[in-house]
Amino acid sequence: MTPVVHCSVGNISLFHIGSFRPSHEIQIRRFRSTERYSRVPSRRLLQPQRAFNLISIYKRSSWSSARRPRTLSAATVGTDVTVEDPNPPPSGETSEESSEDTAPDTAEASEQAEASTSSIPKAGRNIRKSEMPPLNDEDLVPGASFTGKVRSIKPFGVFVDIGAFTEGLVHISRVSDGFVKDISSLFTVGQEVSVRLVEANKETGRISLTMRTGGDYVKPKTETPKAASGGRNTTATTSRGSPRQTRERDEAKSMGETNYVQGQFLDGVVKNSTRAGSFVTLPDGSEGFLPREEEAVALFTLIGHSALEVGQQVRVKVLNVVRGQVTLTMKEGEDDEEDLASLNTQLKQGWSRGTNAFELAFRRNKEISAFLDQREKIIVPDVQEAAVASVGTELDAEVGIEQSPGKEPETGNAESVAIDSSITEVKETDSIAAVEKDSEISKTESVETASSVVISEDDSTVDGKLVEPTASVSATETEIKEDSSEGSVTTEPTEAASTEFVTAVVEESAPTASSVETSEDDSTVDDKLVEPTASVSATEAESKEDSSEGSVASTESVTAVVEESAPVSSVAIEVPAPEASEASAQEIIEDSTTVEGAADDQTVESDSPPPEGVELSSNGAPDSSIAEDKPDEPEESLIVEEVPVTASSESEDKEPAAVPEEVAASSEKTADVAVAGAEASTATATISPALVKQLREATGAGMMDCKKALAESGGDIEKAQEFLRKKGLAAADKRAGRATAEGRIGSYIHDSRIGVLIEVNCETDFVSRGDIFKELVDDLAMQVAACPQVQYISLDDVPEEVMKKETELEMQREDLLSKPEQIRSKIVEGRVKKRLGEYALLEQPFIKNDKVTISEWVKQTIATIGENMKVNRFVRYNLGEGLEKRSQDFAAEVAAQTAAKAPPAAPPKDDKPEETAETEEKKPAVAISAALVKQLRDETGAGMMDCKKALAETGGDIQQAQEFLRKKGLSSADKKSSRLTAEGLIGAYIHDNRIGCMIEINSETDFVARNEKFKELVNDLAMQVVACPQVEYVSIEDIPESVVIKEKEIEMQREDLQSKPENIREKIVEGRISKRLGVLALLEQPFIKDDSKTVKDLVKETIATLGENIKVRRFTRYTLGEN
């Protein structure tokens, strides 16, 4: 219940703040009548029941503070404020009656309240006091600059007083052009700043300011008229949603609105392109989506690239409109096929399907290529009708000939040519399709159509093919008549050619095709077999002469038998791409007679008693064969390559026996050319770009030089390298700079006496950098160091001869004799595996956990990381292994040295005092200070007495003293080089975990091996090996004699030596060999830290400094991923 406090001037009601909604805004609610009123009966003693709100409500977020009271005071001045009864009357009549009764009194009270409120100032917010000059509303123009003072600093910005109706806010994003982290560090209260106006809204009482240099102010909004009653704007009350909700509603309204209809053509500009399609800007500024599959050029869709570019003008059609989103297309339906055809024509320009150099050369000529492409266009239906008509005419003629067997042909000695080219392709329709080409085209091109019959212009002979409707047997009757060529002897026009017998047997129902072409001027037969899916049995054609009757059979039926029960159908027409060979291209230019194509079997026979023929083998060479006299027996052969063979025709008046010999001779000549071209094309085809790249990386030679070298060497990399070296184009055995495998190279050195270098591979570089993989490599290296018997990685790496030897030894053991024969092999296998397992690393128990083997531990690591890992290789060094240490007897050595020095010291007794006297007289001449000796000792590392003596000899000159000590040290080093070195150090250097080296350097005693100078030498030489990938040997003496001989032979064959005199060639070769071999030797390399001296000089200087012999014994270098 709300309490009411009565006072002399009015009533004060107290409201609890919990009844109000918290807000950060300041709202002023003016007078608002809540209900209608009427006259009030005079019997009422209290003030009229008038409910009105003349309440100034101030709600701020700071009211939630605990310091302020939790009540809200609402007061009215100059009038009485009453609160409606919390228990209103239940009946509506009473309320109406009371309202009517109180109406006149309420009106009077309201008049008095208005008079009082007009005379007394309103209670509200205090007027802000500004220290800046006042500004008019007309001055508040966006972009205008003002000077103000900072009034307060907030985390989100600063409030600045510019003298306007309120303080302006400079947001933290507008304080500076850059990023502002702490705004309090930039401003202080009272600081004068220069700002620019962004926006001033007097309705909301807000001013936005900026201190940025850019123009980020906005245009002022147009004021909307207020409500006549003095309340809030009607538009503000109607839209109570947030700006985001309002924007979503506006977008939803405009989503379904569009000005386009389906099927409308538009011109647009490509805005951008994605994998799914392209976005096109339409004329009204909206965007439409063009899917990739709806582009006009569909070919690029197949390979995943679009033909459209950003900014390109396109002509599109509206495919559909869904919820305001327009989907476009560039396809017009009927024009798609034409677009694809034109695209294929453009793409085929400059492209050839030829397999040899001659065809490629012709195809590069635009005129010849256009002519050849034009000839491919063949009208199939007209040719089919002509071929069917000609077949019917030929069949009638054949029937007439068979009815008159007594009539003999005019030419008794007729030749028979059997050609294996009549193979039919079985389809589902019962029709015959044949393709006719004119004779002019048949001169210059090989057979392009499969399953076609080409008829000459004189129509003297017709190739007919008959397919019976029973669809089980197809009968084909073919007659070939040869016209005399220009270079041959012509015959009488009335002379008739003998009839040839052709029997074609197709053993399978697979689609096949053949063509027989007879030209006008040539007697050539172009035969081409196309077999895409199944094997085709050979056909055999024979000519049989009946000498006993004295006549030659004019015609016999020619049948083609299909052994399968599949329905026999039409002969389909295929137009494959022309494949011209080297020989055929040359024949085209010369207009000579050609026979092209490769059938399964082709036999040319004569009517002589032993019939001979020419048969094409797989490489195109002619083989003579004797045909059998059984015309009905088919002969099997294989499908061979299409190797063109040319053969000149023979005139009809020549002797039949001479025909096969001349044909065979011509075929052999042409076959040699074809074989040579085939070998050249095969050699060229085997040289792949990958092979050229490999040779180029290995030698550093040019690309064309590498290609030529591979062609000369038949694709052999080693021979190609020798060829390049003979030409002086590359340095042999150059290694590739990069390897492909990932992984890590690790090392483990135990007490500088046992060393291990190991390479472990993984799949990715990310895993190789992980801690788990690093730990694996280090543990495996330690495992190898702890197992001296380990020689192999796994049992699979054990050589076969070792396995056989162990198996033989186990089979000879006596305890196996009592075992059954069946289980002996298993017992032996188990023993051999256990025996050889001691030499395999993966079979060893892990040194950190002997319950698992190395193999199991690697598998666990693979399961943890999720990548495959493999131990590729390792090497293990034991210091001094293979060297014999001599027993040192110091007493004997001293006695031997004394005995060796005594005899030479005895003779010069008389001269010695004079020399010593002279030296004693010379010594005081040069004053050698201790500081000079110390300086020389620090620079050279020599002994104190040696430095003093060197300075005395050189007169105190430091540089000459250093040269003196160096010469003396080198001479002493040469003398000490013959001493045995069995001690020393094993060192390793790993560069970026991808290149590693392990090296062993020996010294005479372990005392020198522990010296810091010696350790530094070992580390420097290990780094030297890593920096020189071409180094393979320690010194030139370690290079095998076979390598030296081979290098000498290569150098002697170099072309630049041929012009040199004989007497100096040998010296030039020796110099080149020494230089070449010096690249392979470590001691001949320039030192990486000082290239003025070689590694050999560095070792000698160390020998002179330490006083013992030092020898580089061996080293091993690993590169990650190399074979």
UniProtKB/Swiss-Prot annotation:
User: Which pairs are disulfide-linked?
Assistant: none
Pfam families cross-referenced by the UniProt entry: EF_TS, S1
Which residue interval is the transit peptide? 1-73
Q: Does the keyword Transit peptide apply?
A: yes
Main location group: plastid
UniProt cross-references to InterPro entries, sorted A to Z: EF-Ts_dimer_sf (IPR036402), NA-bd_OB-fold (IPR012340), S1_domain (IPR003029), Transl_elong_EFTs/EF1B (IPR001816), Transl_elong_EFTs/EF1B_dimer (IPR014039), Transl_elong_Ts_CS (IPR018101), UBA-like_sf (IPR009060)
Q: Where is the composition biased (Basic and acidic residues)?
A: 245-254, 908-923
Q: Where is the composition biased (Acidic residues)?
A: 94-103, 630-639
* Any one GO BP annotation for this protein: mitochondrial translational elongation
Q: Does the keyword Chloroplast apply?
A: yes
Any one GO cellular component localisation term in the record: chloroplast ribosome
In terms of CDD domains, this protein maps to:
UBA_EF-Ts (cd14275)
Q: Which HAMAP family match?
A: EF_Ts
Q: Specify the protein name.
A: Polyprotein of EF-Ts, chloroplastic
Instruction: Look up and give the organism this protein is from.
Output: Oryza sativa subsp. japonica
